[in-house]
Amino acid sequence: PPWLVNHLEVQKIINDAETAVRGGAEFVIVSLHWGKAYSSEISASQEEVINKLLSSDSVDLIVGHGAHVIQPVLRISNKYAVAGIGNFLSNQPGDERRLCSQCPESTQDGMITWFNISEFPDGNISVTDAGYVPTWVDRSTYEIVPIGVSEPDNVEPADIRRSENRTSGVIGEDLRRLVFRN
């Protein structure tokens, strides 16, 4: 399918993105399932792939997932790479058969990313604003908690704050924290 690109063959991904642009795509987002499990640091190979893909005129944004923890957000020439969005639709809670006491607390962290994409008078399309909302997975209920948006009463506030601090400490300065007011 045209929305699915090949597994980390950088030149093939770039070729597929170029094909998408020739076919009418105005903004290409590359989704990569990658990263060392439970590592908040991006690897040298991830950084190399990010640099190669974002140097292409056909790749506009990278969103990574797979490490089960938050990984940094990089901004290169007004293009973004979210190396890892953490856990949102999955978690490592364990169960009666497979306890997960070895899973780091950071596997409960995730984020919702937001990118404002604008078209300029010259026809150029790019990200003009970007932000995130940190999330936390309650291992007892499997509930996704958007931090600062909707926090249940049955959750320890200290757990939420630790998650929020871990997330902001990893992603860096290139993505601003979105704040919602009631």
What are these regions (language model features)?
Residues 1-182:
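Acidic, metal/ion-coordinating pockets
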